C-alpha cells in the first residue's frame, strides 16, 4: 500500500502500545524488535508508546486503542498476552489466543500439519514416545523460539547431551529427523505469501548466533527457485499458516530434502523485526519499506477489531 494512503487510513488511530521485552529467553531480541516497530509507527505519525510487560502491570494497557505485539517467546507469543488483550477489548496484531498457543508448541503444530496431510519431518517427544529415526537428529525445546536450546545429534551420546541441554529450557523436548538440504522461510502478510528467502550459514544449522550475531549468514531473496517451485513453496507456507489457525502476519520455516520435497519445520506467529529479521527483508522485495510493513500489520488488526 502507498505510504500516503496508509497514513490516511491510520490517521484516526489513538494511542498504540508496542509490547516488547517481557520475561522470556527471547527478551533481548524482543526489545530490538519493539524499538524498530515503535520507530516505524512514529514515522507514520502515530502516537505509539513502548510498553514492557516485565516492568508494568497489564492495567497499563487500559486506555490504549490498539496493541502491536513485538513480544517473542513465552508470555507474548503463546496466547497469554493475546488473552489479556481480548479481555481488555483492545485490537492487537497477529494471531489469536488459540493459534498463538499452537504456534508456540512445535509438537502441536506438527501434529496439525501431519493430520492435514502436509509434509513435516518425522519426530517424537522425548520421554513420552520413541521412534526409530536413526541419526542425525535435531533436538528442540518444544516451546522456545530463536533456535534457543537446539542442537544436532549424530549419535546416542550426543543425543543424551542435547536432551539434557534442551530440558533446561523446556520440559517438552522434540526429537526430529535431520533434513539434509537448503532452508527457506516464507513471510505471510494477510492473505499474501511474500517472496521466499533462502538461508545460508556456515553453522551446522540456522541457530541463534547465525540469526542474530553472525555476519556470515547469507539471505537470498529472490531465493533462486524457478517460478513453479517458488509458487509451490509460497502456497504450501500459506496453507500451513492457515491450518495452524494463524492470521494477520507471521512466518513459516521450510526445508527441501534430498528428494526435492518440501518439509515444514515451524510457524512463527510473532517473527523478529530487527535489522537481521526476515519479514522486513521479504516485504522489501515487494516494494514495502519498514514503515509501510508495520503500518499494514497494524491496519489489519484494526480492521479485524472493527469487524
UniProtKB/Swiss-Prot annotation:
EC number: 6.3.2.4
InterPro entries: ATP-grasp (IPR011761), ATP_grasp_subdomain_1 (IPR013815), D-Ala_lig_Van_CS (IPR000291), D_ala_D_ala (IPR005905), Dala_Dala_lig_C (IPR011095), Dala_Dala_lig_N (IPR011127), PreATP-grasp_dom_sf (IPR016185)
Subcellular location: Cytoplasm
HAMAP family named among the record's database cross-references: Dala_Dala_lig
Protein name: D-alanine--D-alanine ligase
Lineage, top ranks: Bacteria, Pseudomonadati, Pseudomonadota, Gammaproteobacteria, Oceanospirillales
Cofactor binding note: Binds 2 magnesium or manganese ions per subunit.
Reported function: Cell wall formation.
PROSITE patterns: ATP_GRASP, DALA_DALA_LIGASE_1, DALA_DALA_LIGASE_2
Entry annotated with the keyword Magnesium: yes
Top-rank EC class of the record's enzyme: ligase
Sections of the chain in a coiled coil: none
Gene source species: Alcanivorax borkumensis (strain ATCC 700651 / DSM 11573 / NCIMB 13689 / SK2)
Domain of life: Bacteria
Catalysed reactions, as listed in the record: 2 D-alanine + ATP = D-alanyl-D-alanine + ADP + phosphate + H(+)
Matching SUPFAM superfamilies: Glutathione synthetase ATP-binding domain-like, PreATP-grasp domain
Amino acid at each position: 500500500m502507498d505510504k500516503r494512503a496508509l497514513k490516511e487510513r491510520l490517521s484516526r488511530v489513538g494511542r498504540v502500545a508496542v509490547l516488547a521485552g517481557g520475561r522470556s529467553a527471547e527478551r533481548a531480541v524482543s526489545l530490538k524488535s519493539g524499538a524498530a516497530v515503535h520507530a516505524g509507527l512514529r514515522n507514520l505519525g502515530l502516537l505509539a508508546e513502548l510498553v514492557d510487560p516485565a516492568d508494568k502491570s497489564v492495567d497499563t494497557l487500559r486506555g490504549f486503542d490498539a496493541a502491536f505485539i513485538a513480544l517473542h517467546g513465552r508470555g507474548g507469543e503463546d496466547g497469554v498476552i493475546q488473552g489479556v488483550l481480548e479481555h481488555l477489548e483492545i485490537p492487537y496484531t497477529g494471531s489469536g489466543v488459540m493459534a498463538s498457543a499452537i504456534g508456540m508448541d512445535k509438537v502441536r503444530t506438527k501434529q496439525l500439519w501431519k493430520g492435514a496431510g502436509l509434509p513435516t519431518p518425522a519426530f517424537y517427544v522425548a520421554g513420552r514416545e520413541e521412534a526409530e529415526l536413526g541419526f542425525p537428529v535435531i533436538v528442540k525445546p518444544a516451546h522456545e523460539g530463536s533456535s534457543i536450546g537446539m542442537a544436532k545429534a549424530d549419535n546416542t551420546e550426543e543425543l543424551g547431551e542435547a536432551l539434557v541441554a534442551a530440558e533446561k529450557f523446556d520440559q517438552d523436548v522434540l526429537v526430529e529427523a535431520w533434513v539434509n538440504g537448503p532452508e527457506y522461510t516464507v513471510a505471510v502478510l494477510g492473505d499474501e505469501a511474500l517472496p521466499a528467502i533462502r538461508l545460508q550459514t556456515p553453522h551446522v544449522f540456522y541457530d541463534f548466533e547465525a540469526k542474530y550475531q553472525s555476519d556470515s549468514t547469507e539471505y537470498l531473496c529472490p531465493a533462486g527457485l524457478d517460478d513453479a517451485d517458488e509458487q509451490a513453496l509460497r502456497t504450501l507456507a500459506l496453507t500451513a499458516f492457515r491450518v495452524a489457525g494463524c492470521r494477520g502476519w507471521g512466518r513459516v520455516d521450510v526445508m527441501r530434502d534430498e528428494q526435492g520435497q518440501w518439509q515444514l519445520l515451524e510457524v512463527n506467529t510473532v517473527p523478529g523485526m530487527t535489522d537481521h529479521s526476515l519479514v522486513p527483508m521479504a516485504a522489501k522485495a515487494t516494494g514495502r519499506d519498514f514503515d509501510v510493513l508495520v503500518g499494514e500489520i497494524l491496519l489489519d488488526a484494526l480492521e479485524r477489531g472493527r469487524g
